[in-house]
């Protein structure tokens, strides 16, 4: 028997959940499909467990750097126990029950599109007026000779492990790689971080990469730049990676108990039949969407599967965009100023354009960088030997902020000041009229804005 619904949501990660919740509250008849766990990658294997295990080392650092406090010790067993609580011990029954109570039909199976408005999941055939594709992404492990001989992890094994390795090699120096390096090193693991680029976090401003490199080295992490894995092999209990330069020249080897691949993600679209609903797939299987998250007639796509800023908060935002379009109150998605945070120690945050991106767009820019300890009191009241930098990027002609980055304690919390300014295109004169609480990290914006020379 064919079952019919107003909306079918394929994938219940953060984006799918937001869309489903919004539609259910509006009285729509909704069916949701989830092949693994409701909450998706973020809730069980990425954002939530990673930030949970990063917090104890961060707290220890705060205690070590604060005057008059000592004695903080890390307890991995207790940390792992709380992490397991946070990821619900990989059990989503409460979420299944919750959606059922809200009136949704929950199907725990992989859904495949078989035609316009038609979906097959196991032996169930579904039709729907609207389909929302929210199938997420998969971790990428590059093809590597000898890969099957070594102990290879992705974020999933890393953030659900009950036992920490003594030595780890991490391949990839973007956000996941440097966060993972921070977590493991702070818990006493000997970490080697391999990155094929010339600097860490190479999608951020160059200065951000420099500061990240400095702080990771201070944490005892062995960083190998302009280096990649040539092949893998096992020697006894050791997983060995033979290294090469960007030109392919051999440059030694490194051994560890585990090799962690932080080498990106790819949209989960293969074999799911989206083309049968008129969906166009781009590079690496990205679902092509317009500014209302429309992927085809009565088909919508949100989150990692679109390849647009693959962050949880963006997926949730797109979930609102798609649901509102279905409900007849459309408004276009815009991505200016959306924050991005790397939860290292100290934190790294950014919003808007980098200087390189702005230059490529032909924008005449003015930039400034502030050493927080030289400019405001809060870093000194927060910790001894204070850390922290803030960079601002302005459009010299429009006299608005178009980019910002911050490296320092809780940077992910106070980057939102810049994020809102960039997103709303607030004039810098208006920002200068802001009165910041003293002493707070927000005060740094006032000092940095004063440094921007916007005279013609």
Feature annotation, model-predicted:
Residues 1-13, 164-174:
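Beta1/beta-strand and adjacent pyrophosphate-binding region of the FAD-binding site
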Residues 15, 39, 176:
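Hydrophobic/small residue at the entry helix of a nucleotide-binding pocket
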Residues 2-5, 22-28, 33-164, 197-201, ...:
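Glycine-rich flavin
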Residues 105-108, 112-120, 188-291, 353, ...:
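A Rossmann-like FAD-binding core segment of flavoenzymes
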Residues 47, 135-190, 194, 219-223, ...:
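Glycine-rich dinucleotide-binding loop and its adjacent helix/turn
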Residues 8-10, 111, 126-136, 170-171, ...:
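Short hydrophobic core segments
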Residues 10-36, 48, 52-59, 343-354, ...:
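Flexible, glycine-rich terminal cap/loop adjacent to redox cofactors
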Residues 148-164, 254-325:
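FAD-site-proximal beta/loop scaffold in flavoenzymes
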